[in-house]
């Protein structure tokens, strides 16, 4: 797509030519406004508008082009698919017809899909193709859309200024209209575009100044003549009090972004600049037309002429409001001098208002595309759906980022450890692990963090809201105080303060993130996002080996170790290795004898919280897991799963040595000790070893002379239940 500039810089219009008529497209305003706007559109225009003359040599030109391209595409932030989307969007906009292209560019779409939706909306608008006319305002001709005389209020009869002698234009078929407007029908817009590209006015157009003070005074005078009072009477409001007018009088300029009517200058000579009247109208979906004066050799300014595009012949001539249905816009132009240096500065008096205010929350946006994107938050619209898992997104860029989780593509790779990431921001955060950098420091306690989100989460512990009232972070690079860091509630110590702060959320009960489905609240946003997948059923992380899917990437990582056999967490006491760190933590309590979880009913203590939960069901009698076949209830879901295999006959655990299968994995583990000869349970009294723990328990009763199983008939006691069953058969035979 060509940038929004006209022609070549080395062609200057001849000085002896009169005013040149051009059509100023809406996209030119957007493109020139972007020259001082540090946004993606400004970066694109800087790249497309680069000229070889701006560099001192070919090497510098190539280096500048590379840098401008990098600033536009930002490969360190965007993925290849996102950069491709930018190029497709640019080409799509460039392929549109000129009028539609200007109107779509004015909305600044963020993706090709959004641009296509805008084009569809424009095609469905009522109204046929527009025709353009030549409007002569007191002796000067400009291009405008065709309008009816009833669109304007006539001026009082005044004597027009005497035009200067000069060559007369060939006779044309004209229509007389108020204000001395002479209208002649011209060809379609497409012919105007050809004229723009090949005419003498092929120069760069940039943002513009407001009216000069003397021009502003003349504008106000003529406006008083055009709109002296309303039709309700001579005492009605003037144009300055019009309810839809957004008049600004800054730096001597009068303008309400919008419809501009050019006045004939009293001393209309070569090189003079004519003033403009700006009255309100809607430029959001309007075409622009204008006249640009031929510049002097030193370079100078020229004002653009804006005429309303919504003036229809069917407009009611008796309408009391000549400015009905109009809104703000303003465009003026600036010339570049032949030396290539721009003159003037952007006008600050009345910029283009292209966004709007959200009706729901009142938030204001400078661009309509951002407003439309924001409104999807309130409507819940998510038009971009992932074909793999069905998850929907409000923006196509979010969908592309999400799809990388399915393809396992991680284009941003760490040069130190080789770990890949979907987003470059995650790579930058990961690099701080190697460098030890923690730039975000809490001003309250001095704790440093690698990520700002962790700092904001931490500040809630001190009571500082993560907003304008929060204390600013400490200077980056400040060292963290040395550990360990003990918890004031339970005295547990941690090597890092960040881990301590996460642990303290258990005691403080800080749960700032709530689920809209079930109301459950969480202390961390990441945990809330994982919880939402329980309701949606989403399992975006699938194993490439067996196809099993998981809700969390960490679960997939742990599952892969089943296929690879990796057990990275080893016990320092006995050397036993585990696939998960929590399993190792639980195992270490076997050596230390630690049992931190106590039952409040009976005082029995457990090494695992899960075991405490299961134990408490013996007091409450709760059996939340029921079999769908026989209705039998269980206190543990694992027991229900094992029970259901009785109905299905499933025996998923097979011995690789003899092929015998089992319903439970524990039974397979015990069986394999027959082949390996392993006897891990040894008696501390006599040293005898056993393959199963229950067998060791029974053996210990022989040393302790325990006989817990008593016969109800004769009172005889036994140390094994099997011995009691055999004994009871004696009484049954009698």
Swiss-Prot record:
Tissues of expression: Preferentially expressed in differentiating myeloid cells. Detected in osteoblasts.
Single GO cellular component term: nucleoplasm
Induction: By retinoic acid.
One GO-annotated biological process of the protein: negative regulation of transcription by RNA polymerase II
Pfam families reported for this sequence: SCAN, zf-C2H2
SMART domains for this protein: SCAN, ZnF_C2H2
Modified residues (Phosphoserine): 111
Primary localization: nucleus
Residue numbers spanned by region Disordered: 144-196, 459-485
Location of the protein in the cell: Nucleus
Keyword line: DNA-binding, Isopeptide bond, Metal-binding, Nucleus, Phosphoprotein, Repeat, Transcription, Transcription regulation, Ubl conjugation, Zinc, Zinc-finger
Family matches, as InterPro entries: SCAN_dom, SCAN_sf, Znf_C2H2_sf, Znf_C2H2_type
Function, in words: Binds to target promoter DNA and functions as a transcription regulator. Regulates transcription from the PADI1 and CDH2 promoter. May be one regulator of transcriptional events during hemopoietic development.
Quaternary data: Homodimer.
Protein name: Myeloid zinc finger 1
Species for this entry: Homo sapiens (Human)
